[in-house]
Amino acid sequence: MSASVAARWVVLDIEGTLTPTSQVHVVLYDYARPRLGPWIHDHPEDPVVRKAVEDVKSEAGLPAEATAEQVVAVLHGWMDADRKAAPLKTLQGLIWQDGYARGELTTDYFADVVPALRAWRQRGLVLAVFSSGSVAGQVASFSHTTSGDLRGLFAQHFDTVNAGPKRERGSYEAIAAALGAARPLQIVFLSDVPAELDAAAQAGWHTVGLARPGEPYADADFGSHPAVGAFDDIDIEVVS
């Protein structure tokens, strides 16, 4: 499997595309889960935490006077269901940011990822990230990796708060506007989730699916999207 596209911007998913799913669902989720309650308890005056808690109550239909324990129970339920709720992602991102800063977390990537990203960047492609994880969490994850600090590789970061849901066309249109792309076809989106690729294609983007061996979407039907098993199989012609 191989794919050839012409683009100026490369927008990347993280889970299942840059990192193994286990990096998120085992390492990061297991790190955040027991820390959600203590984080809320220890940061009562943090406006970001307060808003996240209020949003949890609103989305879950909890009363305003609901306890922190009730809020945490909802958050744990969302984690169990793998629901990409914005307030959950905000709180997880804060916890992960702290974990990376403490040196307790390190991001590991598929072997083909970092060499490809560096090569694309050196050739003049502009790299950006679109993930359901918060921007704060994204930036932190690139700061402490098995390949060093990779933050300098990426020009912009997008999440479900500043762009929108990953399976909706409008989110990709918003990203294209933020990137300043004169034409949507100047952008290629790399993801392992067919529904996300569908939304990007509806917005006029190029798309490439990642069918990585052993990952949840390895045997998915990517339809009209070209699919590859690794970044080594993608040829991107740089356009202005």
Swiss-Prot record:
Coiled coil: none annotated. GO terms for molecular function: 2,3-diketo-5-methylthiopentyl-1-phosphate enolase activity; 2-hydroxy-3-keto-5-methylthiopentenyl-1-phosphate phosphatase activity; acireductone synthase activity; magnesium ion binding. Its cofactor is Mg(2+). Pathway: Amino-acid biosynthesis; L-methionine biosynthesis via salvage pathway; L-methionine from S-methyl-5-thio-alpha-D-ribose 1-phosphate: step 3/6; Amino-acid biosynthesis; L-methionine biosynthesis via salvage pathway; L-methionine from S-methyl-5-thio-alpha-D-ribose 1-phosphate: step 4/6. The keyword Metal-binding applies. Keywords: Amino-acid biosynthesis, Hydrolase, Magnesium, Metal-binding, Methionine biosynthesis. Binds 1 Mg(2+) ion per subunit. One of its GO terms (biological process) is L-methionine salvage from methylthioadenosine. The keyword Cytoplasm does not apply. Gene3D superfamilies: 1.10.720.60, HAD superfamily/HAD-like (3.40.50.1000). It catalyses: 5-methylsulfanyl-2,3-dioxopentyl phosphate + H2O = 1,2-dihydroxy-5-(methylsulfanyl)pent-1-en-3-one + phosphate. Its EC number is 3.1.3.77. Monomer. NCBIfam families: enolase-ppase. Bifunctional enzyme that catalyzes the enolization of 2,3-diketo-5-methylthiopentyl-1-phosphate (DK-MTP-1-P) into the intermediate 2-hydroxy-3-keto-5-methylthiopentenyl-1-phosphate (HK-MTPenyl-1-P), which is then dephosphorylated to form the acireductone 1,2-dihydroxy-3-keto-5-methylthiopentene (DHK-MTPene). Belongs to the HAD-like hydrolase superfamily. MasA/MtnC family. This is Enolase-phosphatase E1.
